[in-house]
């Protein structure tokens, strides 16, 4: 065909890509949901519903929501990211990964809803943020990071792991969905 693939083949490719994107999003959502359930069941942070500060939770949720909604961006090269990650990381250090996951989900989800993002994009954004904050919070705790954090000289390695894992998981999750949706190799879109 002189203009590339015939229209029916392009539509088949688009439908296949869409199916792959939905499957990828479903896996990320399942991972996020399972991690929240496991963390609240195990309560590794020691911050229990009886000891958590409701006012503190609401403050972190409000700040995360506001920054996410304001779309204040951190730009590095061609990559644009909301600065709301600062709030999510802070909530992980104060409340632990279970509560940080809840704060992150409510903040990102609320902003996606108010911003009228497409449903699949909104669901993915919530889930990938939750997976990133859970993985990074668990890495922090596994390396002996205290909650809430003590003087930084006692928690440098756990804190660095928290940051590196958060950005790595976030980058891999977003790059994965972009690679699938655009039909490009992961290495070409990894940010």
Annotated model-derived regions:
Residues 2-80, 86-191:
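Short helix-perturbing small/polar motifs within transmembrane alpha-helices
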């Amino acid at each position: 065909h002189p203009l590339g693939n015939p229209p029916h083949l392009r539509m088949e490719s688009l439908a296949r890509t869409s199916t792959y994107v939905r499957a990828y999003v479903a896996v990320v959502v399942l991972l996020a949901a399972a991690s929240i359930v496991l963390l609240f069941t195990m309560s590794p942070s020691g911050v229990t519903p009886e000891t958590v500060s409701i006012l503190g939770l609401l403050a972190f949720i409000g700040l995360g929501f506001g920054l996410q909604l304001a779309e204040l961006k951190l730009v590095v090269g061609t990559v644009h990211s909301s600065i709301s990650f600062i709030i999510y990381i802070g909530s992980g250090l104060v409340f632990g990964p279970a509560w940080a996951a809840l704060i992150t989900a409510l903040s990102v989800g609320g902003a996606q809803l108010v911003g009228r993002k497409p449903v699949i994009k909104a669901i993915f954004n919530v889930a990938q943020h939750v997976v990133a904050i859970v993985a990074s919070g668990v890495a922090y705790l596994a390396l002996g990071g205290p909650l809430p954090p003590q003087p930084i000289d006692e928690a440098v390695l756990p804190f660095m792991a928290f940051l590196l894992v958060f950005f790595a998981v976030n980058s891999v999750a977003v790059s994965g969905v972009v690679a699938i949706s655009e039909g490009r190799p992961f290495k070409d879109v990894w940010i």
